[in-house]
């Protein structure tokens, strides 16, 4: 009995010595792990196998920034996100330890990349995973406008009788031949070029406008380049948008530019909703200045025909921001996003990152090893950090864990690692923004 008591005393003495060196670990390995959070999704089964040996992967399933859990705000050093939420400077300042954000998709207009860079947060995207899907969807929309398959289907569903030549002429009114038509592409990046290759096979003459692209690409693809937006709008029978959204091209298609288009031209947008002034488009459709439009993206998402200026617009096809999607593309995007996070953990930020889009705004550069690791985590891969506080789950494939004490409170940590603080207001480098760099003319989403 005395031997047992002696052992207990010795154990208590060791516990007092170790107290403050590292927190109590409820399960998993004893080494520190950075927290990486999927902000607006709930499935991290693809990401976990890539990151589980380096980081703890959790998900928030937030539908707005207000739903991001306090634990993630305080402790996450890496974040992955889709297009559901928007991170402004005010939102980014709430993150205490964040160093890298990876947008699972090509567009990054839902993140303030300048503010992120000034706060020492790298922002990355996945520019190439859904190029084929977006190009295929764009061609589908263009063919639909020219051949009117959607409206013909609707007519049959409504019971319209179509038999005589006169009835066919009436129900298919507006259908047009494609060969010899001019397709104008605004933006000629990966997706724009993929659309051009496909469109030529259908007989389109393809022209494009892209002020950021170097000369010569038009010769390799057998297309024509124009050097002003006005020239493209004037020459095109169908205009398709393939550029990212930024502060310079918001409402690029507006009442003024619509009046520069050919009478009865078509408009397709599978890039970003903010590129098109929907009020001006609705008016142009009603007046017949635009013969038809197909939109996969909208100014306000999720889109509803019941609301907004397009609810009464004729000759309009809308899809719910799905042009980017296929199972293969989704899987490739998620794998690429997790791999980019892995590069950040094992290398330097932003130098080691493959697709960092805000390097010109970045004010700090350091290896991951000097990140302020305020959270030393047990291996709780798949944990859910979301509101209301106290709700905890494990994603499919996650390891079962003792959750008590993890949600909602944090784990106190004492360490000797140097602190990396986010400057409250750091000046932007005296370096012009290159809007053509690191951009993909559209999207996933």
UniProtKB/Swiss-Prot annotation:
InterPro entries: CtBP, CTBP_dehydrogenase, D-isomer_2_OHA_DH_cat_dom, D-isomer_DH_CS, D-isomer_DH_NAD-bd, NAD(P)-bd_dom_sf
Modified residues (Phosphoserine): 428
Subunit relationships: Can form homodimers or heterodimers of CTBP1 and CTBP2. Interacts with HIPK2 and ZNF217. Interacts with PRDM16; represses white adipose tissue (WAT)-specific genes expression. Interacts with PNN, NRIP1 and WIZ. Interacts with MCRIP1. (Microbial infection) Interacts with human adenovirus 5 E1A protein; this interaction seems to potentiate viral replication.
Gene Ontology biological process terms from the UniProt entry: negative regulation of cell population proliferation; negative regulation of DNA-templated transcription; negative regulation of transcription by RNA polymerase II; positive regulation of retinoic acid receptor signaling pathway; positive regulation of transcription by RNA polymerase II; regulation of transcription by RNA polymerase II; viral genome replication; white fat cell differentiation
Protein name from the UniProt record: C-terminal-binding protein 2
Record Pfam families: 2-Hacid_dh (PF00389), 2-Hacid_dh_C (PF02826)
GO (cellular component) term, any one: transcription repressor complex
Positions contributing to NAD(+) binding: 106, 186-191, 210, 243-249, 270-272, 296, 321-324
Spans annotated as Disordered: 414-445
Localization terms from the record: Nucleus; Synapse
Asymmetric dimethylarginine found at: 22
Organism whose genome encodes this protein: Homo sapiens
Biased composition (Basic and acidic residues): 434-445
GO molecular-function terms, A-Z: DNA-binding transcription factor binding; identical protein binding; NAD binding; oxidoreductase activity, acting on the CH-OH group of donors, NAD or NADP as acceptor; protein kinase binding; protein-containing complex binding; transcription coactivator activity; transcription coregulator binding
Family note: Belongs to the D-isomer specific 2-hydroxyacid dehydrogenase family.
Tissue note: Ubiquitous. Highest levels in heart, skeletal muscle, and pancreas.
Active site per the UniProt annotation: 272, 301, 321 (proton donor)
Function: Corepressor targeting diverse transcription regulators. Functions in brown adipose tissue (BAT) differentiation.
Keywords: Differentiation, Host-virus interaction, Methylation, NAD, Nucleus, Oxidoreductase, Phosphoprotein, Repressor, Synapse, Transcription, Transcription regulation
